[in-house]
Amino acid sequence: MWTPSRKQLCLAFLSVCVLSAGSFFFHLNGGNFFQNALTFSVLCPDYHLLKSPVAMVCLPYPSNASSGSPSCPEQSLLSGTWTITPGGRFGNQMGQYATLLALAQLNGRRAFIQPEMHTTLAPVFRISLPVLDPEVDSLTPWQHLVLHDWMSEEYSHLEDPFLKLSGFPCSWTFFHHLREQIRREFTLHDHLREDAQRLLSGLRIGPAGIRPRTYVGVHVRRGDYLEVMPNRWKGVVGDRAYLQKAMDWFRARHKDPIFVVTSNGMRWCLENIDTSHGDVVFAGNGQEGTPGKDFALLTQCNHTIMTIGTFGFWAAYLAGGDTVYLANFTLPDSEFLKIFRPKAAFLPEWVGINADLSPLQAQFDPWETDSLFRLA
């Protein structure tokens, strides 16, 4: 009777181990082992000497309530890796996050955010997208795509497995079909929500101390827009007359409303917003570096008045209810209209109140600015 030698037994055992390991990696990688080197790259650090690595390694963030993001992504059937270059401030990066999530899902890709975006958004929201390791980012063979600020058919058929998006997308046309998921991603941390609700619950209207029935968040965008809008884009920001009309719109439709004003130009608000009704409170701190408090206040209101900017858009989008926005805030020949489409920026059910462009029209009227031509 034949009896295998010790050497033959060892070789047989080794073969079984190799086959088992190969089967494990094959199934773990969704049957796409050779096209996607994720598992092999993680297990073999020197693999990048042979092939550009595509492993996505999470940063070692602690998984606690303040971080918002899980320390590593769950296994999924999605392939490839997409990310987006963070840019701008809080509202801009919210738009970039939501657009990345929506486009990656639409094209069957995995989405990862940059550490800078995590630093901006995670202190405020319970975001779930994992973070891309900087070293992996630097070694990945990215394709690049600059997005414009509205959804296009071409964005539904993007075939690049390793794609780095850029631009400042913040249009509901990218992600509105995922509204409930977006709202979950932008869920406030408990302490921010509770602080906002505590402040709102203590507000009263007028000397009689009437308890408000409706809370209207008001975001007045000023700051750098005071220079950028007229000088670069031939546009205006929300003025006193616009805010008065917007508040009157709500007063005509809701009993006992209270207006909760936040702004990065609170001094102007104090001097220009009519408080004679006793229904206006200046509640925000206007700190652009720590926007969580102001944003939480706005989203916990029932309705929104916004002027311009992505911060106000997101406050209105997450608060729900009625939204009044500043419409037609640039001259018709503004370069801004080449990168901004109002129908893609404001939801159809939102209510627009036209801006007063007369100061701009006088500024750019050749009869007013060219005295020689006027005399001729």
Curated annotation (Swiss-Prot):
<dbReference type="InterPro" id="IPR002516">
    <property type="entry name" value="Glyco_trans_11"/>
</dbReference>
<dbReference type="GO" id="GO:0006629">
    <property type="term" value="P:lipid metabolic process"/>
</dbReference>
<comment type="pathway">
    <text>Protein modification; protein glycosylation.</text>
</comment>
<dbReference type="GO" id="GO:0009312">
    <property type="term" value="P:oligosaccharide biosynthetic process"/>
</dbReference>
<dbReference type="GO" id="GO:0032580">
    <property type="term" value="C:Golgi cisterna membrane"/>
</dbReference>
<dbReference type="GO" id="GO:0005794">
    <property type="term" value="C:Golgi apparatus"/>
</dbReference>
<dbReference type="GO" id="GO:0008417">
    <property type="term" value="F:fucosyltransferase activity"/>
</dbReference>
<comment type="similarity">
    <text>Belongs to the glycosyltransferase 11 family.</text>
</comment>
<protein>
    <recommendedName>
        <fullName>Galactoside alpha-(1,2)-fucosyltransferase 1</fullName>
        <ecNumber>2.4.1.69</ecNumber>
        <ecNumber>2.4.1.344</ecNumber>
    </recommendedName>
</protein>
<keyword id="KW-1133">Transmembrane helix</keyword>
<dbReference type="GO" id="GO:0036065">
    <property type="term" value="P:fucosylation"/>
</dbReference>
<feature type="glycosylation site" description="N-linked (GlcNAc...) asparagine">
    <location>
        <position position="302"/>
    </location>
</feature>
<keyword id="KW-0333">Golgi apparatus</keyword>
<feature type="glycosylation site" description="N-linked (GlcNAc...) asparagine">
    <location>
        <position position="64"/>
    </location>
</feature>
<keyword id="KW-0328">Glycosyltransferase</keyword>
<dbReference type="GO" id="GO:1904906">
    <property type="term" value="P:positive regulation of endothelial cell-matrix adhesion via fibronectin"/>
</dbReference>
<comment type="function">
    <text>Catalyzes the transfer of L-fucose, from a guanosine diphosphate-beta-L-fucose, to the terminal galactose residue of glycoconjugates through an alpha(1,2) linkage leading to H antigen synthesis that is an intermediate substrate in the synthesis of ABO blood group antigens. H antigen is essential for maturation of the glomerular layer of the main olfactory bulb, in cell migration and early cell-cell contacts during tumor associated angiogenesis. Preferentially fucosylates soluble lactose and to a lesser extent fucosylates glycolipids gangliosides GA1 and GM1a.</text>
</comment>
<keyword id="KW-0808">Transferase</keyword>
<dbReference type="Pfam" id="PF01531">
    <property type="entry name" value="Glyco_transf_11"/>
</dbReference>
<dbReference type="GO" id="GO:0010595">
    <property type="term" value="P:positive regulation of endothelial cell migration"/>
</dbReference>
<feature type="transmembrane region" description="Helical; Signal-anchor for type II membrane protein">
    <location>
        <begin position="13"/>
        <end position="29"/>
    </location>
</feature>
<dbReference type="GO" id="GO:0001954">
    <property type="term" value="P:positive regulation of cell-matrix adhesion"/>
</dbReference>
<feature type="glycosylation site" description="N-linked (GlcNAc...) asparagine">
    <location>
        <position position="328"/>
    </location>
</feature>
<feature type="topological domain" description="Cytoplasmic">
    <location>
        <begin position="1"/>
        <end position="12"/>
    </location>
</feature>
<feature type="topological domain" description="Lumenal">
    <location>
        <begin position="30"/>
        <end position="376"/>
    </location>
</feature>
<keyword id="KW-0443">Lipid metabolism</keyword>
<dbReference type="GO" id="GO:0008107">
    <property type="term" value="F:galactoside 2-alpha-L-fucosyltransferase activity"/>
</dbReference>
<dbReference type="GO" id="GO:0001936">
    <property type="term" value="P:regulation of endothelial cell proliferation"/>
</dbReference>
<dbReference type="GO" id="GO:0030155">
    <property type="term" value="P:regulation of cell adhesion"/>
</dbReference>
<keyword id="KW-0735">Signal-anchor</keyword>
<keyword id="KW-0812">Transmembrane</keyword>
<dbReference type="GO" id="GO:0021772">
    <property type="term" value="P:olfactory bulb development"/>
</dbReference>
<dbReference type="GO" id="GO:0031127">
    <property type="term" value="F:alpha-(1,2)-fucosyltransferase activity"/>
</dbReference>
<keyword id="KW-0472">Membrane</keyword>
<dbReference type="GO" id="GO:1903672">
    <property type="term" value="P:positive regulation of sprouting angiogenesis"/>
</dbReference>
<dbReference type="GO" id="GO:0006486">
    <property type="term" value="P:protein glycosylation"/>
</dbReference>
<keyword id="KW-0325">Glycoprotein</keyword>
